[in-house]
């Protein structure tokens, strides 16, 4: 297992990051963790599609991505969301590096269902050697885009991308930032769950539809070797940890 932490940040969260976020990143970096941040850009994409009067359609939470929407997605992620996050981290004197799939074919993907989703894909390969070399000296800031083997760009769900990266890079920890402090049951944040317990809470609708994709991503990470997957609204807060075994 690599001393690596993979963090997923939504586009909305980029403008709302607190000082404690940067302090925690700095602390992990000083502790010699390699850090990879996968960022979304939903609000930035929505702003562009609205300005150009393009329709927005989603299927099972995935943005249907036609050719025009794909261009705007690349523009929003690589020209707006990523530079904004890089600027904030640089202001806190952190050594950062903006990354995307075209950097030595870092991320390879394939279409999920072109007829239903357009240019939406899943990751099929990660250039592990190149990426880990880059992370040896920098905090990586990676956009959730992939390239097919023939060079076609794909829009990839950021939670799914972060999960696959954590799996492929043998990360110690996956942190999925969201807008709630964790999985809430009877008014309290549940500190830890096993994958089996989490699935039961999904079946009984304790974990609602909006949270389910993140929980499923966390479960997938744990079941493929990631030691801990955390769902939280702040990286310095414990949130809910999905772990292999939970003490009774």
From Swiss-Prot:
It catalyses: N-acetyl-L-glutamate + ATP = N-acetyl-L-glutamyl 5-phosphate + ADP. Gene3D superfamilies: Acetylglutamate kinase-like. Substrate binds at residues 41-42, 63, 155. GO terms for molecular function: acetylglutamate kinase activity; ATP binding. The record marks 8, 214 as: Transition state stabilizer. Its EC number is 2.7.2.8. It is found in: Cytoplasm. InterPro entries: AceGlu_kinase-like_sf, AcgluKinase_fam, ArgB, Asp/Glu/Uridylate_kinase. Pathway: Amino-acid biosynthesis; L-arginine biosynthesis; N(2)-acetyl-L-ornithine from L-glutamate: step 2/4. One of its GO terms (biological process) is arginine biosynthetic process via ornithine. Keywords: Amino-acid biosynthesis, Arginine biosynthesis, ATP-binding, Cytoplasm, Kinase, Nucleotide-binding, Transferase. Pfam families: AA_kinase. GO terms for cellular component: cytoplasm. Catalyzes the ATP-dependent phosphorylation of N-acetyl-L-glutamate. HAMAP family: ArgB. Belongs to the acetylglutamate kinase family. ArgB subfamily. This is Acetylglutamate kinase.
């Amino acid at each position: 297992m690599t001393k690596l932490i993979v963090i997923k940040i939504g586009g909305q969260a980029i403008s709302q990051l607190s000082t404690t976020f940067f302090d925690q990143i700095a602390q992990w970096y000083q502790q010699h963790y390699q850090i990879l941040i996968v960022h979304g850009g939903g609000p930035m994409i929505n702003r562009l599609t609205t300005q150009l009067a393009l329709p927005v359609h989603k299927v099972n939470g995935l943005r249907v991505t036609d050719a025009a929407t794909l261009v705007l997605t690349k523009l929003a992620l690589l020209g707006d969301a990523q530079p904004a996050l890089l600027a904030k981290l640089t202001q806190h004197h952190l050594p950062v590096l903006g990354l995307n799939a075209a950097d030595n074919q870092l991320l390879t993907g394939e279409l999920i269902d072109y007829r239903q989703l357009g240019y939406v894909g899943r990751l099929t390969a990660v250039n592990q050697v190149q990426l880990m070399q880059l992370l040896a000296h920098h905090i990586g800031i990676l956009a959730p885009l992939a390239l097919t083997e023939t060079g076609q760009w794909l829009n990839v769900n950021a939670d799914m991308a972060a999960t696959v990266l954590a799996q492929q890079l043998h990360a110690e920890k996956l942190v999925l930032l969201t807008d709630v402090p964790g999985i809430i049951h009877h008014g309290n944040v549940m500190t830890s769950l096993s994958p089996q317990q989490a699935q039961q809470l999904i079946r009984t609708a304790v974990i609602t539809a909006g949270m389910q994709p993140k929980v499923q991503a966390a479960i997938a990470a744990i079941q493929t070797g990631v030691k801990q997957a955390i769902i939280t609204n702040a990286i310095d807060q414990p949130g809910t940890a999905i772990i292999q075994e939970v003490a009774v």
